Amino acid sequence: MARYIGATCRLCRREGMKLFLKGDRCYTDKCAFARRSYAPGQHGQGRKKLSNYGVQLREKQKARRIYGILEAQFRKYYEKAETMRGITGENLLKLLEMRLDNVVYKLGFGSSRAEARQLVTHGHFLVNGKKVDIISYQVSAGDVISVREKSRGTEKFKTFAENPKTLPAWLEGNIENFEGKVIAEPTRADIDVPVNETLIVELYSK
């Protein structure tokens, strides 16, 4: 699968805000954005006023970067969201939130979405008792996500279990048993990403 391999901190600087792509590092003074919050490049400190199209494009890019998705796949999510009942923008965010890599991250098994993606790819997780290593796998309400038995003894997963996260309302965690459950589909109020999905819909509707 194609993926972005450039400097992660440049993405935060490009969007003009912390996207928390490096997990715990983003909360320290080692964070590149804390030291240089202007855009990368020779003219980065002289930000120009964006056109309406530019604002819409930046919002879409921000969403892509938060969830670690390339353009072609992001477009497919949008097209699927259009066919679903309800509000297209909210449907789009719901599809992104219910990716397995994001759910693993939200459950606290990963300090960032990037780390969660890596752990899923390496086969550390089960969905309803079966190994799933596809990061884009769409979970459903009622699904149980658990850490494989042989992975639970590693220092990384012990650390996750000892430092549980506050979970969103649509997830339920059982850290002692290294598992979590999707108890409902997320509502817009449950999704805390700093994205204005209406701008993305406006961009793709042109």
Curated annotation (Swiss-Prot):
Residues 98-164 form the S4 RNA-binding domain. The keyword Nucleus does not apply. One of its GO terms (cellular component) is small ribosomal subunit. The keyword rRNA-binding applies. GO terms for molecular function: rRNA binding; structural constituent of ribosome. InterPro entries: Ribosomal_uS4, Ribosomal_uS4_bac-type, Ribosomal_uS4_CS, Ribosomal_uS4_N, S4_RNA-bd, S4_RNA-bd_sf. GO terms for biological process: ribosomal small subunit biogenesis; translation. Pfam families: Ribosomal_S4, S4. Keywords: Ribonucleoprotein, Ribosomal protein, RNA-binding, rRNA-binding. Belongs to the universal ribosomal protein uS4 family. NCBIfam families: PRK05327.1 (NF003717), rpsD_bact (TIGR01017). One of the primary rRNA binding proteins, it binds directly to 16S rRNA where it nucleates assembly of the body of the 30S subunit. With S5 and S12 plays an important role in translational accuracy. Part of the 30S ribosomal subunit. Contacts protein S5. The interaction surface between S4 and S5 is involved in control of translational fidelity. This is Small ribosomal subunit protein uS4A. It comes from Clostridium novyi (strain NT). The gene is rpsD1.
